[in-house]
Each structure stands twice: as C-alpha cells, then as structure tokens.
C-alpha cells in the first residue's frame, strides 16, 4: 500500500521584502504540485511589484531588484487573490500542502490578503480542510536532539534532497516537497499510520512545544524574546487603540 506521503502533494513558498510578517511584502511566490514520487512537477509562479522599495539585504538573498519587479511584476491585489484561490483549489482536492516554516509564508500571505483584498486566508479557504505539512516542524520533533541549524538548505543536505537555486520560490517549494517525502520515509514507522489531518493537528502541538522551548532558551541566555506558538498561521494582531 502506498503511503500518503508518496502520493499527491503540493508545496508553497514565497520570497519577500523581509522577515516581518506584519509589515513586509511578497515579491514572488510559487506553488508546485506532484501526483506521486518521481512524477512530473507542475509549477505555478507569481512575480509581484510590492509597491514599496525592496531592501538591499533582501535583494542579496533572492536577487529580485526594484527595477526588475517594477518592469515585470504585477500589482499585489490580483496576485494575492490568485494565490489564495490556487491554494484553496489544491487543498480542496485533499492534497496536503507542504510549507517550510508555515507560520511565516502563510501569515505573510494572510496579511497581504487583508491589506489588498480586505479578506483573509481563512476566508478563501472557507470549508476547505487545510492540511499543512511543515518539514521544519517535523524534523525538529522527530530528531529533536540533533544539534545544528534547520534551514531548508541544511535539511536538504541532511536528507540528501537536491536544492538547485536556493531562494527562488519555485526551487524552494520543490525542494520542500521532496524533503517531506524524505523525512516521512526516514521516520515511516512513526508517521505512516497518521493521516494528513492527524499529522496537521500534531504539528500544531509540536510547534507550540518547540516555541516554549526556544523561549526558555532565550531566557536562559539572558536575552528574553517571545516566540509565537501559533501554527500554521499566526492570529491577526489586535488593532491599535
């Protein structure tokens, strides 16, 4: 019997103006879909003119300049609508959605939808079940005592997954998809009996525990810092009085 992680998966990734999910903007995004291990990968790409300058530090990471985005990018409102509809369509088929560090990409998309569409990611999903698989959360739970960084590049190296063109949204999404397959194979005895819906719920619990552990480490190091326990989407911040 083929396990779900060898079957249909989709994966989503973004490149952005920075790391603040409340203020930064999406400049490119990609969704990849694959029906089975080794099957053809279908890629949908979006390029966005964010309407604000892209910091030099962000351009150094993903290579997208203000000039390139102004010439080739589309305005955010229709792009965010397309992205959200595409994610909803994929999830409606029952495909698990792979998102590396999901609270970043999905929260940023949610804030862009609120900014440009007066809507939310939950509004687009409506009754569509969201079954996210986050390779970062999986690896951190399943191999919790391993030292070292857990970036996409590091995890791909560890699990022997090719990553060509890191910090390109399509390349990162494709690598994240293969990374989930590789992690689930390695830890198959612990995961194969879980449905995607059950794994989604467990990851929310695991991520919250990981956030508490990181907060404790920060406090012990003398640099207290809050870590949001929400997964896969951070709640909207309350409006300022």
List each model region and its residues.
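DEDD superfamily 3′-5′ metal-dependent exonuclease/proofreading module
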Residues: 1-27, 34-39, 71-241
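Short glycine/proline- and acidic residue-enriched helix-loop micro-motifs
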Residues: 64-70
């Amino acid at each position: 019997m083929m396990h779900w992680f060898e079957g249909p998966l989709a994966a989503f990734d973004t490149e952005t103006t920075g790391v603040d999910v409340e203020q930064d903007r999406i400049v490119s995004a990609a969704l990849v879909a694959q029906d089975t291990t080794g099957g053809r990968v279908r890629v949908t790409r979006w390029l966005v003119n964010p309407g604000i300058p892209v910091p030099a530090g962000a351009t150094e990471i993903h290579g997208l300049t203000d000039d390139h985005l102004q010439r080739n990018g589309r305005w955010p409102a229709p792009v965010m609508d397309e992205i959200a509809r595409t994610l909803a369509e994929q999830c409606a088929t029952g495909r698990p959605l792979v998102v590396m560090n999901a609270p970043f990409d999905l929260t940023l998309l949610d804030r862009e939808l609120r900014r440009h569409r007066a809507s939310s990611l939950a509004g687009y999903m409506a009754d569509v079940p969201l079954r996210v698989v986050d390779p970062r959360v999986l690896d951190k739970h399943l191999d919790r005592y391993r030292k070292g960084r857990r970036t996409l590049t590091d995890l791909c190296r560890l699990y022997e997954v090719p990553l060509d063109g890191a910090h390109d949204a399509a390349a990162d999404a494709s690598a994240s998809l293969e990374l989930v397959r590789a992690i689930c194979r390695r830890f198959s005895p612990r995961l194969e009996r879980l449905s995607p819906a059950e794994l989604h719920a467990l990851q929310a619990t695991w991520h919250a525990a990981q956030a508490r552990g990181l907060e404790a480490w920060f406090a012990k190091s003398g640099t207290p810092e809050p870590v949001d326990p929400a997964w896969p989407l951070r709640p909207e911040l309350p409006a300022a009085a």
